């Protein structure tokens, strides 16, 4: 089932845990909005997007190392990805500085200092409000810091 032109439910729910990971109702709706309003513009600008993690049900989230107990992934509101053939920094800079995307958080993430491995992008308003929107951060595997141009 397609969520948008280029993204499917299967792609956005893939997990290596072996646990059931099926979004329903509100989570499925949020996934559709996420794909249409955030991931599609990235794909249109740069080309194919490889999703590392989309929806994560509570069991899958609990089995994911380093995942927040309050992750927007559990609500279908976030995705971790990279763009095939593009540097993470190029895509991230475009999202934060050049696009008009209305995101909640854009995070350049990695598990080793100075080595980002994916971009986390989550829905903004009305899913997040106020200062929790348009947050651009860098995560080095230990701490979050504001993104600096």
Regions found by a protein language model. Name each.
Residues 3, 60, 70:
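Glycine-rich, flexible loop/turn motifs
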Residues 23-24, 50-56, 90-95:
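N-terminal start-of-chain detector that recognizes signal peptides
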Residues 34-38, 60, 77, 87, ...:
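Amphipathic alpha-helical interface surfaces
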Residues 66-72:
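Non-catalytic scaffold segments within catalytic domains of secreted glycoside hydrolases
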């Amino acid at each position: 089932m397609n969520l948008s032109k280029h993204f499917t439910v299967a792609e956005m729910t893939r997990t290596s845990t072996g646990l059931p990971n099926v979004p329903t109702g509100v989570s499925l709706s949020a996934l559709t909005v996420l794909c249409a309003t955030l991931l599609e513009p990235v794909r249109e600008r740069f080309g194919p997007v490889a999703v590392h993690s989309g929806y994560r049900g509570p069991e899958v989230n609990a089995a994911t190392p380093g995942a927040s107990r309050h992750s927007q992934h559990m609500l279908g509101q976030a995705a971790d990805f990279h763009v095939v053939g593009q540097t993470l920094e190029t895509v991230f800079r475009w999202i934060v500085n050049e696009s008009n995307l209305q995101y909640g958080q854009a995070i350049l993430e990695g598990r080793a200092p100075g080595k980002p491995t994916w971009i986390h992008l989550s829905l903004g308003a009305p899913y997040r409000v106020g200062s929790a929107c348009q947050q651009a951060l860098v995560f080095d595997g230990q701490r979050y810091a504001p993104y600096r141009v």
